[in-house]
């Protein structure tokens, strides 16, 4: 799949409590050809993912005024949809926060303020990694059980064993 086709097929959900940050990220990603949706709090994020699963989630760690913070949203979504790639963002992040979010299943962590090039690069890598994981799963399903022998002659048995 070409980079352009991957972008057109990719819908990204952006979750941040600051409208200007949501708009900035959406604008950068739109300019790169991605489709975006936005949510401003944890309830909006969970509802948006459950209604129509995005290909990627860009999630702020500190969701002011929300029932859950970004780490709790990450925990919830990783239980429900473990293969959903999530990129965490924060302006108040520490190395410990970044490591904790990645240990909980985030693909990567971007500290605010960020450069547009970094965001574009991480989003592209996350989508490509998710695509490759899906392809591997599909190939494993097509290949079937690895332990099946093509034949059962003594010559084949000697080669396989």
Residue spans for each PLM region:
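Charged docking surfaces used in two-component/phosphorelay signaling
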Residues: 23-31
């Amino acid at each position: 799949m070409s980079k352009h086709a991957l972008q057109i097929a990719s819908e990204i959900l952006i979750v941040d409590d600051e409208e200007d940050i949501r708009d900035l990220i959406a604008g950068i990603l739109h300019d790169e050809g991605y489709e975006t949706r936005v949510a401003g709090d944890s309830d909006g994020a969970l509802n948006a993912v459950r209604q129509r699963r995005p290909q990627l989630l860009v999630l702020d760690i500190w969701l002011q005024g929300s029932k859950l913070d970004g780490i709790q949203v990450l925990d919830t979504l990783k239980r429900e949809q473990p293969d959903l790639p999530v990129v965490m963002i924060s302006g108040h992040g520490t190395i410990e926060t970044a490591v904790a979010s990645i240990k909980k299943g985030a693909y990567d962590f971007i500290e605010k303020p960020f450069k547009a090039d970094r965001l574009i690069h991480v989003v592209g890598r996350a989508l490509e990694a998710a695509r490759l994981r899906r392809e591997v799963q599909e190939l494993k399903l097509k290949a079937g059980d690895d332990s099946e022998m093509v034949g059962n002659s003594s010559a084949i048995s000697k080669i396989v064993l």
